[in-house]
Amino acid sequence: MTDVSSPAGGAASPVEMSTTSSSSAATTSASSSKPLTNGANKTAISTAAGGVTPGAVPGPGSGAIPASSSSGNQVKLEHHHRQSNNNRPAVTNRSSETKLMTPTGSSSSPSQSPSQTQASIQTQTSQQDRLAKASTTASQQDVDEVARLFEEKPEAFEKWLTERAPPEALSRLQEFIENRKPHKRPSVTSDLFQQWMAASPTVQQKSPRSLSNSSASSLPECRRHLMDLDEGELFMELIRDVANELDIDVLCHKILVNVGLLTHADRGSLFLAKGTPTNKYLVAKLFDVTQKTALKDAVTRASAEEIIIPFGIGIAGMVAQTKQMINIKEAYKDARFNCEIDLKTGYKTNAILCMPICNYEGDIIGVAQIINKTNGCMEFDEHDVEIFRRYLTFCGIGIQNAQLFEMSVQEYRRNQILLNLARSIFEEQNNLECLVTKIMTEARELLKCERCSVFLVDLDCCEASHLEKIIEKPNQPATRAIKSADSFEEKKMRNRFTVLFELGGEYQAANVSRPSVSELSSSTLAQIAQFVATTGQTVNICDVIEWVRDHNQIRAEDEIDSTQAILCMPIMNAQKKVIGVAQLINKANGVPFTDSDASIFEAFAIFCGLGIHNTQMYENACKLMAKQKVALECLSYHATASQDQTEKLTQDVIAEAESYNLYSFTFTDFELVDDDTCRAVLRMFMQCNLVSQFQIPYDVLCRWVLSVRKNYRPVKYHNWRHALNVAQTMFAMLKTGKMERFMTDLEILGLLVACLCHDLDHRGTNNAFQTKTESPLAILYTTSTMEHHHFDQCVMILNSEGNNIFQALSPEDYRSVMKTVESAILSTDLAMYFKKRNAFLELVENGEFDWQGEEKKDLLCGMMMTACDVSAIAKPWEVQHKVAKLVADEFFDQGDLEKLQLNTQPVAMMDRERKDELPKMQVGFIDVICLPLYRVLCDTFPWITPLYEGTLENRRNWQDLAEKVEMGLTWIDHDTIDKPVEEFAACADEEIKDIEFTVTTLNCNQQSQHGSEDSHTPEHQRSGSRLSMKKTGALGKAVRSKLSKTLYNSMDGSKPKTSLKLLESHVSEDMDDKSPTSPSQPQASGSMGRMSASSSTSSAGGQMVDKSKKRSKLCALL
């Protein structure tokens, strides 16, 4: 069945469009219509001019034929049209319709004379024949020629369209193209959403298929046309009419109009179910809609006067509650009927048919109600009931789809609003009032409420109440006591409101106030907000007076008389702490707030909390930045050297570089006092000609040096003297090592400054410790933590008043030297060294000799900084082992902190209990870091060979000491590791008294796999004057051979046997209880001997020592 107004047959041809536009009688017909059949033909003919009366059908002759004429006329008319369609081209079909009309487009008036009517018809017929002939001729003769031209020269056609085509032709061409496009089914797409957002659904242009969109005058014709269909075709046509409609307003209007057509009902109403599962009600979507009621009028009337019917009340309410149909034959005799509407409108209701609308799950989603029959019947019969039920079954599916689509549209709008709120949070970070006002405005408009309020909690009061109290109990340690449960009043005191934002009601614009305690306590709305802030629960109040009565803490006041519904929700921050309360008062339509409203309002509360928290964090950050500036000013003042110190250093005489031994790689600071260290630094700047080269004021340089020294902490190793040694090594590499030929003066200045500042404010702990303890420095700098801090301290000192030694530099030179300083300081991180080492080695292996490129220079400076930072390893042995002691003690202090604070076992180099392994670890440090670095630098720059040679010498010393530890000769059992064991040899020429040695004979045949345990005296049980030997029981052959050789070679050559005999005579066999025994071996094989040497024997042994070998082995004393 073809719809009356649908373009089902496709688009009309351009010739047809030309013909119809030339005739004023066809102005109301669509250009895309095609010939209709059966009943549709009659309707098309009767409505073509728009002026034919409903009771007449135009005939092929001169006048209108009465509707009461025999059906034979209709058959002849249809036959005439069929014959005309067969004999003429399709284009003349419109002309045949036009011939029946006057030139004005109306039917021939019966008052016209036959001659006038005949003349008019003949004139019109001749005009139409000429137009049709011209169109036919053009279509047959010219189309082929034009087509060939278009095919041969499409560029010319395109140029003609763009330059010379008339606007009317372009418009008709566009219309033709649009009409040729297939009709698309409406779908939930972004285009549909955009169309939905562009205009209100009730005023948008509706689909031409919609029967409910027809004008009031055309409805009788449409109805008559549909009534000529059989019942099945009519039913399917009306189902198709509502099947794809997604606008709930349009859908409800179509349903009521179509139901009126099906059941001959005079008018109808449609109610939709709303509310919560415990409080459901019906809302009149459209009310008293007739077949002539326009959609816009129906929607406007329903919006202006919203009718709400609770479930179980009235006829519609009973149908919704029971899900049963109600058919009332005489309304005024039914007690459930409310005649107030009839009294208002003057309409009398006789028969009522009310039926539920259910979804696929069987739940009530609406109620449809029709009133009074129009075909003369006084009641709705069973046939009407059945048609009504069948049609509403399909309508239930359509309503649910439309509601889902409406929900998706609402969600889309909600997301857009929330997106705007998210933008507002970033735009209004510094203005809390503007942010809250914007959020309240959006919430009030979206949820359609009368008033909106936001209460902010006094955070200072809340924080102060959570302070832990330290309570001393008798005979018990101090404990933290926090109440597990506070009373309601105590929680109220913590959540005290300080700021109130109000919008709506008497405040059309946002009002911000700071209510007093008395004002808050006398306001019911404030008390409700206080309750929500205290409990942290959302409150949705439908009856305020009853709710207030149930909560004794809330006192009812006069302000609640006008309050019908309240939705109150807590606002929380990221820590789930209540920072405010949002409150909505009264829906605009007088209904309670729904769960959907609460869900939407929750999103607003979350964004409000995020915005408030973000704004407060921003304010706190601004305050902290101000505090930081004050702290930096104080730090700068106290970190800067005093004027007296500066004047004194300025007036001091600076000795020559040779007197400080600055050119030597064996420089040591042990004999320099603190003032001399500063003078040595000044001398290095002078020798490099930096003071005059960069116009550094001498007093500024002195103050800067003193300030740098002042900002080093008194840790054991990474202190000011370490910085001095690093700077001196850099100076020696530049001068003695001739590295200055590869550097510019500006780079030399940057390197010396970097060396002096590379460990500023060092805390005696490394980067790993900062990360493990999550210190502020580790949070501030994620990589190279301490190195970044050292550079920042360097910048802070330079920015302090009177300390900027770069003040005379140009901006470009300043940026360059600061870049050099930063890169050099960061290069002292060994992690950076390992990253750069491979690239540097590759350049060296390729024979690189040009180091002037930026990347190459950066690599070279980085390697030089690392070489200077670890240069203590190349100092003379007397200096090296003392520095090693300082480094070890600092590491051990960090290990103690890790045990105490982190409860973790430190690594070996930081474990005080494993200090005997220090020589071995030093050898590993030299092999992994120092020797490879110095070797490659020495191969490339041979003038710095002393660093490599000093490192090799110290490695031999540490390796020798590591072997002694392996033999059981450990560090002297002092709390510190001041002296290595070989320094006892220096005392060989002195009389050794009262020193008791414990010598243990070792079972060299016994293997460690026997499960022997270390039986040497624990470290904490050793006396200060006792030397122990480890009883490993499994010394290697090489170690035993070396021990024996050292023993014999240390004796007097003339008395070797006597000395050995003397040694053996004092060895008594003794069984050690801790020595392991094996069942397969006699216990005597693991026997141990103990010897006590008296002072006289020790003296005699000491006299046999060659005095020229003061650093001989310990065994020489035996």
Swiss-Prot record:
The gene is Pde6. GO terms for biological process: cAMP-mediated signaling; cGMP metabolic process; negative regulation of nucleobase-containing compound transport. It comes from Drosophila melanogaster (Fruit fly). Pfam families: GAF (PF01590), PDEase_I (PF00233). A lipid is attached at residue 1115 (S-farnesyl cysteine). Its EC number is 3.1.4.35. This is cGMP-specific 3',5'-cyclic phosphodiesterase. Inhibited by sildenafil and zaprinast. Residues 247-399, 431-612 form the GAF domain. Residues 18-33, 46-56, 63-72, 102-128, 1084-1104 have a biased composition (Low complexity). Gene3D superfamilies: 3'5'-cyclic nucleotide phosphodiesterase, catalytic domain, 3.30.450.40. Residues 1-142, 1006-1035, 1065-1118 are annotated as: Disordered. Hydrolyzes the second messenger cGMP, which is a key regulator of many important physiological processes. Has cAMP phosphodiesterase activity in vitro but not in vivo. Has a role regulating cGMP transport in Malpighian tubule principal cells. The active site is at residue 718. The keyword Hydrolase applies. Residues 1116-1118 form a propeptide. It catalyses: 3',5'-cyclic GMP + H2O = GMP + H(+). CDD domains: HDc. A divalent metal cation 1 binds at residues 722, 758-759, 869. Expressed in Malpighian tubule principal cells. Also expressed in adult head. Interacts with PrBP. Its cofactor is a divalent metal cation. One of its GO terms (molecular function) is 3',5'-cyclic-AMP phosphodiesterase activity. One of its GO terms (cellular component) is plasma membrane. Signal peptide: none annotated. Keywords: Cell membrane, cGMP, Hydrolase, Lipoprotein, Membrane, Metal-binding, Methylation, Prenylation, Repeat.
